[in-house]
Amino acid sequence: MSIWVDADACPVVIKDMLYRAARRTNTTLTLVANSFLRVPPSPLIRAIQVPAGFDAADDLIAERVAAGDLVITADIPLAAAVLAKNAQALDPRGNWYTPGTIEERLRMRSMLDQLRGSGVDTGGPSAFSQRDSKSFAGELDRWLSRQRPQPDASAPQSADEPPTE
């Protein structure tokens, strides 16, 4: 299992969390962006710079993501492509994209695009907050803990481990 990041619009605080989590859990982390990214030196962390172009980073992630991987993105069409490949998608604010919600999110995005195209000011998302950061951290930690192999209940217990039931 790997974590992929649509990194062009990903907040720095989220990237920093992901770097620490990758090292702590020995998880491969790949950041994809149209611009150069400086990432910490680690065999687990890599950055891929794609040529400038509409959806180039999204297309690469959608092509390479595998079932069971996690993708961090605020891009709804990318999240839909990720879910179609049986991977999971989480936005930088800690909200999961799910098969049950993705169609509604795509419809809402399309409607807002149409309104903006006709000159209506639809505003934008609220500023990224500390609450968003905490929500993301909690969801990431829960996902990472579900990925760890569970101890085998039939395996012999060491003397300093409590018995499992």
UniProtKB/Swiss-Prot annotation:
Bilayer-crossing regions: none
Stretches for region Disordered: 115-134, 139-165
Pfam family of the protein (one): DUF188
InterPro entries on file: UPF0178
Signal peptide: none
HAMAP family membership: UPF0178
Family: Belongs to the UPF0178 family.
PANTHER family the record matches: UPF0178 PROTEIN YAII
Protein's recorded name: UPF0178 protein Bphyt_5655
Organism: Paraburkholderia phytofirmans (strain DSM 17436 / LMG 22146 / PsJN)
